[in-house]
Amino acid sequence: MTDPPAYVILGRGHWAKRMHVIIAGENRKVSVIEETRQYPDENKFAYIARLTAAMIASGAQIAWLCVLPGPHVSLMTQAALEAGLHVIVEKPWYGSKEDTERLQALAREKRRLLAVHFEYLVLNEVENWKTNFHPGAALQFGGHLFLSRSDPSSIPALHNLGCHLLAIREFAVPASSVSELQCGYGCSDERLVWIEQGGQRLSCIDLFTHGQPIIQRFMRKVEGALKGIAFPFDLDFALRVEKQVNAYESRMSG
């Protein structure tokens, strides 16, 4: 039996610390690279080279980028691929179409997996939606995602939270129409998605009280993909979700 893959986490915030505990709890070797910011006098080539060297030195096979989105994520992804690691990126994906295609080409060249972490997609109920309702052409999709805490990221709620909702739609019922999306911080906690037909609710999923080990399941899906099992949550998927977020944002402001 081969040893399970080792992980290296890039980041030092709350999410990076949480992921460290979860990954270690799955009996995986895990190390951390906390210094992930580009220095003021460091060009992007030197930045990539520094991170590449640090990831090679970690001895890991999978890099998990636990950082806020931005242009640096594409550079960090490139560094991980150059180091020969598989890569998990946190949602939302802000890379351009050109960036996405370039990184996917590099991943194919290196024969490495590029995954985007949308945690709710491995819920039993979401997978049941895909089985029972896909593609959902005659259905309407809606969702609320409200958090009582404040937003530490400065990312608009529709992008940071709404992408969770629209990722569920894209995975389970991509042909459905979007009837309602509401997201925000500083409100009573609510994480709910539903599908309707003709004004009648067919099914709803409470994302707040599921109690399922969804991060661990996502890890198993990633590790399964390294053995050749199909993996749907790649950059193409993330880019489709971000396009849906932008389309809904335009629709609401138009």
How should each PLM-predicted stretch be described?
Residues 175-222, 226:
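C-terminal substrate-binding/catalytic lobe of Rossmann-fold NAD(P)-dependent oxidoreductases
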Residues 1-43, 55-56:
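N-terminal Rossmann-like dinucleotide-binding module
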Residues 151-159:
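Glycine-rich "substrate-gating" loop/helix at the edge of Rossmann-like oxidoreductase active sites
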Residues 30, 47, 87, 113-114:
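Hydrophobic beta-strand scaffold residues
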Residues 94-152:
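A contiguous active-site-proximal alpha/beta segment in oxidoreductase catalytic domains
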Residues 41-88, 92-106:
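Beta-loop-alpha module in the N-terminal Rossmann-like domain of NAD(P)-dependent dehydrogenases
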Residues 1-4, 62-67, 112-113, 221-254:
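C-terminal helix-rich "cap/oligomerization" subdomain common to oxidoreductases
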Residues 122-144, 159-183, 244:
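Oxidoreductase and adenylate-handling cofactor-binding alpha/beta cores
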